[in-house]
Every structure is written in C-alpha cells, then in structure tokens.
Amino acid sequence: MRELIRLVSSAGTGHFYTTDKNKRTTPDKIEIKKFDPVVRKHVIYKEGKIK
C-alpha cells in the first residue's frame, strides 16, 4: 500500500516536499538530494511524517 510521506529539508529552512512511497518495497526511510528554493541549493531531504 502506498503511503503519503513528507520530505523535510536538512538545511533547516522548514521547506518540504510531499510524495508517496510503497512501504512494502522500501521499508527504510528515504533520503533524496533535491533543490531547496529558500537557500537556492541542492540539499538532502529526509523522510518525515505528515501531520
């Protein structure tokens, strides 16, 4: 089953992306390098829960 997740910026800007993932095939937490428009750089985004 696909579940909604929140990718939070590690730069500490508070910026986040929302996406979904298949919990059965990827049970561990996702870490992806994406663009943060606040600092205008590519930074690591870590998975967090949607509140």
From Swiss-Prot:
Keyword field: Ribonucleoprotein, Ribosomal protein
Keyword field contains rRNA-binding: no
A Pfam short name: Ribosomal_L33
Cellular component annotations (GO), alphabetically ordered: cytosolic large ribosomal subunit
InterPro entries documented for this protein: Ribosomal_bL33 (IPR001705), Ribosomal_bL33_CS (IPR018264), Ribosomal_bL33_sf (IPR038584), Ribosomal_zn-bd (IPR011332)
GO biological process, one term: translation
Disulfide partners: none
N-terminal signal peptide: none
GO MF assignments: structural constituent of ribosome
PANTHER family: 54S RIBOSOMAL PROTEIN L39, MITOCHONDRIAL (PTHR15238), LARGE RIBOSOMAL SUBUNIT PROTEIN BL33M (PTHR15238:SF1)
Family membership: Belongs to the bacterial ribosomal protein bL33 family.
Name recorded for this polypeptide: Large ribosomal subunit protein bL33
UniProt source species: Pseudomonas syringae pv. tomato (strain ATCC BAA-871 / DC3000)
